[in-house]
Curated annotation (Swiss-Prot):
Its main location: cytoplasm. This is UvrABC system protein B. Residues 31-414 form the Helicase ATP-binding domain. It is found in: Cytoplasm. It comes from Lactobacillus johnsonii (strain CNCM I-12250 / La1 / NCC 533). Residues 435-601 form the Helicase C-terminal domain. The UvrABC repair system catalyzes the recognition and processing of DNA lesions. A damage recognition complex composed of 2 UvrA and 2 UvrB subunits scans DNA for abnormalities. Upon binding of the UvrA(2)B(2) complex to a putative damaged site, the DNA wraps around one UvrB monomer. DNA wrap is dependent on ATP binding by UvrB and probably causes local melting of the DNA helix, facilitating insertion of UvrB beta-hairpin between the DNA strands. Then UvrB probes one DNA strand for the presence of a lesion. Forms a heterotetramer with UvrA during the search for lesions. Interacts with UvrC in an incision complex. The lineage of its organism: Bacteria, Bacillati, Bacillota, Bacilli, Lactobacillales.
Length: 671
């Protein structure tokens, strides 16, 4: 049994000291948790260094920490930052390991069954194994994760109990070690040495752990005793160092044995018989035959080889759980006294809540038509209330916390002062009558100063009309609409920063990647028209777009001041006065953020993909050259992944078939 090392401390490394009001935020949050607060909110204005504050809180509390964000891009950014802050501690990355994932689905309208299809990223799989092995063996662990952390991951007790511990001088025969390795899903391969494999040369066994990317362990025997353990470079065999003791963690998170499998098969058979009787009683003979045939095949595979495609749908039986019981997840691998940080909580909490319902709807159709047993519903993400039961202490981090977070706790800590001294922008309310002419005058002032302008409208038609009007006046302007893809959007933002145009018009300017230091004016048209984009939270976020420039200003065009406007204006003015007071006391002069303008990759490819997609139906693959086919495979793969993300299973399946056909043709030509 593995024992967790509890004596390691977090060591924060940074050339910066807490600045602005980071210090007071760190102290209040740390004191709050140490005094037993279960939930706290860090409400940090844009550009105040919330991640650095999070790192300081982690270091001071010295608890294993799970940081959750709502998309892979942000998870990657946070992972990189925390790796820099904590180079001597374990910082792990945990996201879905699928490069491509099309879930099993059935479309009753067209009687189309689509099998699960996926492609696993080996590097991410290795990082997931490193995460769980770190959590089992040490306390100084920070895991940065996506919402994948609330999906099933196997029983941590079985995982821990299956760890093979080896030490110098230990009495164990070579053959017993080989059997133990096979039991935890390691494969013997004396030629192709990869993660999750071992090889044998006489009295020497080399093991490549599942959680390592380039290190392996060489175990040397003398009779039935371990004589020496060394860590080696898995590629060159060069000795890195000697080890007195090592722990080999299972090569899978779903650990099983003969007893577990026998119990699971008996339970699956019982459920199958009940479901067959139910269908027959309802006169659904096709569904009854289908579920019996499919389940019997799966059971035969599991009995013979210990695995079947879609085995995760039987996880409730494998783990001995009751119907409706939550699955084991990454959260179960943490000790009880751990800390959760929810980054961008206004977006992450709704995502955590939505996972369960989306998963259930798809599986219910498979069950209703006899493709899966009802227990497949228990292979699922956690419900929100189940996630809440895992919470020991939690910190929600956002510039605009959502209603959920605000209802969880009264303990809110503000972080208002920016280390750069930048202020929240001035806000001015002007009448709607003559708003366009007034706006043109303000735009021209900014153009003279080589600054940029954001204009937000309420309707697509108004945005288009305003764009045309400004163009007729000779103003360089672009319209950012919802049909524009991510990469193209980034190119437009880059062109704005470079000065290729001066004004960007949009309906929703709250998406990622739209922070532009060169923007000194944000104009909000029809600010008094209540609705989603004119409610308090989006208004505050929109105002924040002018907070990265020392000349930042916001003009709201409105004939009356709504409650949402008043709340947003009051909050901004309060922060601005505090920031001005701080700057005056400390002799700080606000400076516009200097941010490098980076190239946007693959922009041309994105537009080429769009053209290829439109002409895909007209193509005859036989007429393409080998090179064209290879390029087409890449293009269709990207489209397939996009279709799967949108849950357009039929389109994804059609594209997959086309890809397989192309690959077959390319392979045949090679011969």
């Amino acid at each position: 049994m593995i024992r967790r090392q509890k004596n390691k401390k977090f060591e924060l490394v940074s050339k910066f000291q807490p600045a602005g009001d980071q210090e007071q935020a760190i102290k209040k949050l740390t004191d709050g948790f140490e005094q037993g607060e279960k939930a706290q909110i860090l409400e940090g204005a844009t550009g105040t260094g919330k991640t650095f504050t999070m790192a300081n809180v982690i270091a001071k509390l010295n608890k294993p920490t799970l940081v959750i964000s709502h998309n892979k891009t942000l998870v990657g950014q946070l992972y990189g930052e925390f790796k820099e802050f904590f180079p001597k501690n374990a910082v792990d990355y945990f996201v879905s390991y699928y490069d491509y994932y099309q879930p099993e689905a059935y479309v009753p309208q067209s009687d189309t069954y689509i099998e699960k299809d996926s492609s696993i990223n080996d590097e991410i799989d290795q990082l997931r194994h490193k995460t769980t092995s770190d959590l089992m063996s040490r306390n100084d662990v920070i895991v940065v994760a996506s919402v994948s952390c609330i999906y099933g991951l196997g029983d941590p007790r079985e995982y821990a109990a299956s760890v093979v511990s080896l030490s110098e001088g230990q009495e164990i025969s070579r053959d017993v070690l080989l059997r133990d390795l096979v039991n935890i899903q390691y494969d013997r391969n004396d030629i192709d040495f990869q993660r999750g494999r071992f090889r044998v040369r006489g009295d020497v066994v080399e093991i490549f752990p599942a959680g390592y990317s380039d290190h392996a362990f060489r175990v040397e025997f003398f009779g039935d005793e371990i004589d020496r353990i060394v860590e080696v470079d898995s590629l060159t065999g060069e000795v890195i160092g000697e080890r007195e003791q090592v722990s080999i963690f299972p090569a899978t998170h779903f650990v099983t044995n003969e007893q577990i499998m026998e119990r699971a098969l008996a339970s699956i058979k019982d459920e199958m018989n009940i479901q067959v009787k139910k269908f027959e009683g309802e006169g659904k003979l096709l569904e009854a035959q289908r579920i019996k045939q499919r389940t019997t095949y799966d059971m035969e595979m599991m009995s013979e080889v210990g695995y079947t495609n879609g085995i995760e749908n039987y996880s409730r039986h494998m783990e001995g759980r009751k119907a409706g019981q939550p699955p084991h997840t990454l959260l179960d691998f943490f000790p009880d006294d751990f800390l959760i940080l929810i980054d961008e909580s206004h977006a992450t909490m709704p995502e955590l809540k939505a996972m369960y319902n989306g998963d259930r709807a798809r599986k219910q159709t498979l069950i209703d038509y006899g493709f899966r047993l009802p227990s497949a519903l228990d292979n699922r993400p956690l419900k929100l209330e189940e996630f809440e039961k895992h919470v020991n202490q939690i910190m929600y981090v956002s510039a605009t916390p959502g209603d959920y977070e605000l209802n969880q706790t009264d303990h809110k800590v503000e972080q208002i002062i920016r280390p750069t001294g930048l202020l929240d922008p001035e806000i001015e309310v002007r009448p709607i009558k003559g708003q366009i002419d007034d706006l043109v005058g303000e735009v021209n002032k900014r153009i003279e100063r080589n600054e940029r302008v954001f204009v937000t409208t309420l309707t697509k038609k108004m945005a288009e009309d305003l764009t045309d009007y400004l163009k007729d006046l000779g103003i360089k302007v672009r319209y950012l609409h919802s049909d524009i893809k991510t990469l193209e959007r980034l190119e437009i933002i880059r062109d704005l920063r470079l000065g290729k145009f001066d004004v960007l018009i949009g309906i929703n300017l709250l998406r990622e990647g739209i922070d532009v230091p060169e923007v000194s004016l944000v104009a909000i048209l029809d600010a008094d028209k209540e609705g989603f984009l004119r409610s308090t939270r989006p208004l505050v976020q929109t105002i924040g777009r002018a907070a990265r420039n020392s000349n930042g200003k916001v003009i709201m065009y409105a004939d009356s001041i709504t409650d949402s406007m008043r709340e947003a204006i009051d909050a901004t003015e309060r922060r601005r006065s505090l920031q001005m007071k701080f700057n005056k006391e400390h002799g700080i002069t606000p400076k516009t953020i200097v941010k490098p303008i980076r190239d946007v990759i693959s922009i041309t490819k994105d537009s080429e993909d769009k053209e290829n997609k439109e002409s895909f139906a007209d193509l005859n693959f036989d007429e393409l050259t080998k090179k064209q086919k290879q390029n087409m495979i890449k293009t269709l793969t990207a489209q397939m992944q996009e279709a799967a993300k949108k849950l357009d299973f039929e389109e994804a399946a059609n594209l997959r078939d086309a890809i397989m056909d192309l690959k077959k043709q390319v392979h045949e030509k090679k011969k």
